[in-house]
Amino acid sequence: MSNNKVRIYDLSRDLNLDNRDVLIICEQLNIPVKSHSSTISESEADRIRAAAEKYVPSPSTHSMPPTRPTSHSRPLPPQPGKPQPKVPQTKVPQILELRRHQTPAEPATGSAGSSVAPVSRSPVEPQAGLPKTASPQRPVRPAAPGSNSPSHSESTPVTPPAISKPAVSSSPARTEPLRPAVPPPKAAPSPAAMAGRAEPSQPGPQKPVLKRPKVESPQAEVESAPVATATPAPASPRAELTPPPRRELPQLKAPPRPRSETSEDGARRGEKLVARAPEPPGTETDAIEVLQNVSLPKLAGRGAKRPKTKAEEEDELQEELAAKTPKTATKLKRRPQLKLEDEDDVDFAAEVNVQAVVDVSQSLVRPPKPKAAKSAKPAAVATTRISAPKTGGRKLSRRDRRQQEETQERPTSVVLSGDLTVQELANRLALPTSEIIKTLFFKGIAATINQMLDLETASMVAREMGMEVETPEVESTARKVTEMLEAQDLENLQRRPPVVTIMGHVDHGKTTLLDAIRQTKVAQGEAGGITQHIGAYHVDVEHEDQVQQVVFLDTPGHEAFTAMRARGARVTDIAILVVAADDGVRPQTVEAISHAQAAEVPIVVAINKIDKPTAQPDRVKQELTEYNLVPEEWGGDTIMVPVSAINRENLDTLLEMILLVSEVEDLYANPDRSARGTVIEAHLDKARGPVATLLVQNGTLRVGDILLAGSALGKVRAMIDDRGQRVEAATPSFAVEVLGLGDVPAAGDEFEVFNDEREARAIANERANQQRLSRLQQALSSRRVSLTSLSDQAREGELKELNLILKADVQGSVEAILNALGQIPQNEVQLRVLYAAPGEVTETDVDLAAASNAVVIGFNTTLASGSRASADQTGVDIREYNIIYKLLDDIEGAMEGLLEPELVEEPLGQAQVRAVFPVGKGFVAGCYVQSGKLIRNCKIRVLRSGNLVHSGTLNSLKRIKEDAREVNAGYECGIRLDDFQGWAEGDQIEAYQMVTKRRTLNPNA
């Protein structure tokens, strides 16, 4: 107990009061306490001490030790067998009761205080009914304590053995009328029920008489006996039972009628008792019966709980709810309290309407039924109802799932387009994942639910399940998916310049041809002489005495830049296919043809390098016919123009053909609307931030427009054309560099101008979330291992990994490098790109590389200040490249370096056994070296008639009785082996040694 806390029982001991008296004072002062062991603050204790000085029944604190029995007053019922000795004790206070009859007459009806003194002892008898009396009378009590104190002091000496201190406190004036009725008949039965309190008087013989009327109502006796046994358990909570009626007191205080009636009835009864005390004992027995009946409901209520059938039912319920026993136990204890309150109400009504004993017995008969109904059963039933639906709901949910699984129809065919996990494959096949894993296990592949399966393995599993596997045709990325013109644009259409894309194989002269057209020297400034970006250029061409503009897009020809070529074909109006006359059709030429055909754009073939002596234009035309490109002179519809970019031959003819084709195509756009188009290229500039090259395909783009390109949102701050000049507006078919975006968009994304920034931001956030999910999926797939014989190594952690951080100049370069890296065999060494983005190499990239043991690759980009020093300090390797060939070669070499070198057998020479000599315990083979040489401690094989006889190590090699390190061809030598002695003439000896050899990446491994 802390210094500022006081316990109730310590306070009662200091005040020489009973615990119940202190609890009553606490209730009067509205101090919340639960029991005598509760703690209160010092301030509350001081309030209780002050109130205790005015508390009248406190003199009965001498009965404190008995009050503990009164707290066990419930156990007092076991004393019904011993009521007679206690009855004489209760007989003594009969004289006091006679005084009481006098006192009520003197103070009139309002002398509730005087009546309280006798009540203090007599109300103890109807303890069973105490709660009911306590509920209305306690409000009266605080007013009376002062006046009653003298009378109590007088009564205390008379009742030193009296035990019923709490009864005194709880007894109201209302109980006084019952008291006078009790003493003349010698209300020993009530003290017998409550255990003798401060009323000893009234002869013992009358007590059996009182019980005889109870015998008349067998229910009373039957119920009283069990009550005696049942009451001890609730005895402890009884102290707590008093508070609830007290809470109801304020409600009962409001109606004074019951109190006045009870007081008047008490007075009347008192008068009758005074007159009838000697004359009619029958009336006394009637009053006693009334008192007994009042207490009986409590006994009956408690006895109703005890029937065997109910106990058995409770036991069954407890067994069903074994897990919730602690909760139910507490509830069971509380419910009897509530029932007692209900019984008190019934008793109170019985006291107010004192009628025939038959009415009282009927009221006694009624409570047991509702009490039995209120017994622990409802609680248990309620809990079972609550718990039952839970378990039932779970069962139903499982059934529903099973039904859904059963009702889900299995498809007869499945479309597989790429790698996928076991879970995804199971969902597509409408099968449980366990079936997929089991099938793979039978095939010798141990897989988990998140294991990535390559297309071949997934197809094999699907076929094992009896399904047809369909592989969809890969849609060309060059196909035009969005129509830039809308219905409302049709009224304001105007002609626009054609967008021409130059495509072809690497080193066939695409950029040189464009330079010749533009009269610039772009090709000379390119690293390695190859184009690695898309360039957008504007050229003014004179045609029919008019200057017309043509927009040229130059695409890379290297195989790694497939996506760039496809992107160029998707946005173009006319494709110029450049083919070298001396080289013919090459792989990237074929790819460019497929892109142009997928985009459904007309193709103009420019046969370049006709100035070379080895040029064969006709052979080129013949090769192109295999791809449905038939020249016009051969009866086809494909325009083919032989040109020489170096000598500027036939360039005017080529431009004229381009303009003619553009006229046939009817190229129109609406410049009076907000701009729409495609991102050609994008990169992160160190000084200017994100920079995107945009091709406006419809509408007009102006400075200040709110632009959304993919998930990148921003406001156009500046636009720069291909010659480095700032422009304020970009009309259809115009390519410009745009500054002001918040992020680097992906090349190939479509852009659009919005009037409402909030709408644009919402769309940008949605697209960013989708990109984040796709990146997560790519990260998962980057860790995949093909389910081959090496999958075991992957699971055991033996699979080598090469971590890369890639930084390039533009988004298109990043895309091209990633695609090229994906073509490298990764069966034995897994290639993981941790981060790939356009921009310069920063210290953050170096820190990430140091944490993940990665190599930083920079392509056509620079190093930020401090990044090189940080890399040197942390030991991070930064590789810079400007040609994609070298980048890919070095990465392949690094991956091969991670492979464990393999041991390879290297042949040394051959020898033949010519003779066998016994030496000591063994034999020596005299041999002749036929080819190569024999080296001591090398590996040898002994072959006899082509069959292997022995394989081991050459332990001893001698030449003319001297040890030799090696013997070359054409010489004789002696060979001795420690573990082989079965030499025979004619045996062939093959000498070899095991050497380590660097492994190479094997795509079929």
From Swiss-Prot:
* Primary subcellular site in the record, as a coarse category: cytoplasm
* Region annotation G2: where it falls in the sequence: 529-533
Subcellular localization, as worded in the UniProt entry: Cytoplasm
Which residues take part in binding GTP? Answer: 504-511, 554-558, 608-611
Please list the residue ranges that the record marks as compositionally biased, kind Polar residues: 58-73, 146-157
Q: Which InterPro entries match?
A: EF-G-like_DII, IF2_II, IF2_N, P-loop_NTPase, Small_GTP-bd, T_Tr_GTP-bd_dom, TF_IF2_bacterial-like, TIF_IF2
Q: Which Pfam families match?
A: EF-G_D2, GTP_EFTU, IF-2, IF2_N
Record SUPFAM superfamilies: Initiation factor IF2/eIF5b, domain 3, P-loop containing nucleoside triphosphate hydrolases, Translation proteins
Give residue spans, biased composition: Basic residues.
392-401
Q: Where is this region: G5?
A: 644-646
Q: Bias category Pro residues: which stretches?
A: 75-86
Query: Residues annotated as region Disordered?
Result: 54-337, 368-414
| A single cellular component GO annotation | cytosol
Concerning PANTHER family, the annotation shows:
TR-TYPE G DOMAIN-CONTAINING PROTEIN (PTHR43381:SF5), TRANSLATION INITIATION FACTOR IF-2-RELATED (PTHR43381)
Function per UniProt: One of the essential components for the initiation of protein synthesis. Protects formylmethionyl-tRNA from spontaneous hydrolysis and promotes its binding to the 30S ribosomal subunits. Also involved in the hydrolysis of GTP during the formation of the 70S ribosomal complex.
Q: Which NCBIfam families match?
A: IF-2, small_GTP
The name this protein goes by in its record = Translation initiation factor IF-2
**Which organism is this protein's natural source?**
Cyanothece sp. (strain PCC 7425 / ATCC 29141)
